[in-house]
Amino acid sequence: MNVFCKIILPLLCIISCSERKEIEVYNMELDENKKEVLVEIRNNTENNYYLLSPIVSIMTKHLQDIGVEMIEGQIHHKKLDSIVCSVCIWDDICKEEYYAMREIVLLPKKSVKKIKYKYDSEEYIEIETVHIGFPYNGYYNEIGKKMQFMLKKKLDSSNIIKGYEFYNKDIETMTIKM
């Protein structure tokens, strides 16, 4: 019993604690009556972070992609957008003819953030999947990693959103299959 308490219990604690992600998609729900998707993202860390443009996509049974817009849980910041455009020149939002601002989602430490998305469809559609992805997180090729490193460095040094830093690590996506 003594060996169990001294060796096995601490080992089990280390394993269970290490499996918890820093930032994770905690829950995702589709409300077909309201035509909304609720996403809950949990920050398990002691730091305040923000995410850039988490994207929900909805695919129908006929492989049609439905437009989805974030309607709750975000802020916008013009200076932050210009910093992102100075690094991510490939981004469509940075093109002059296409003006929009990125959604910024604040994730206070040790909390769950709720984000709502709305989709528009005049007729009834059969939804196949609902998916959330993170376009500014978790690059695997060298160019993407360098761009991500430069973006984090520029955003964090600018301290645009006081008390928060840009979260650029990989976040596991979530997909609901209907």
Predicted ranges, named:
Residues V39-N48:
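Asparagine-centered strand-capping/turn motif at beta-strand->loop junctions
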Residues L51-L107:
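The feature marks short-to-medium sequence segments in extracytoplasmic or secretory-pathway proteins
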